Amino acid sequence: MIVSICILILLVCIYIYFFPFIPKQKKHYTYALLLGCPAHDDGTMSSSQIKRCNLAIDMYKKGLYGTLIISGSNVKNEYVEAEVMNTYIRKRVEIPTILETHARNTFENFKLSKKYIQEQDVLILA
């Protein structure tokens, strides 16, 4: 029993030596990019949209970013993803936002938002 405890302590010490704890740095990003997803066909928000918007609100309240870029077009139906999500967020908190309303997929979300982000670090919210 004592030998097992000693071996366990030794293994923990070895692990700590080779894999030390690195605290997460709380970084502030100039921009956060909120990736759009389709609303329901009747224009109501999908659960994915609501979850993503709530994540954006929470991260803003924690001070992790300054301006929110919401990216997404009307891919599945007539409702523009970025506009639907922006309406939801604006009813809950005032966040500086940029709407990118032409992206039709994730690749285009990044490509078309690049003009705003430039070379800045960005927080991706999905």
Where are these regions (language model features)?
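A structural signal for short, hydrophobic/glycine-enriched beta-strand patches
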Residues: I16-A126
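N-terminal type II signal-anchor transmembrane helix
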Residues: M1-K24
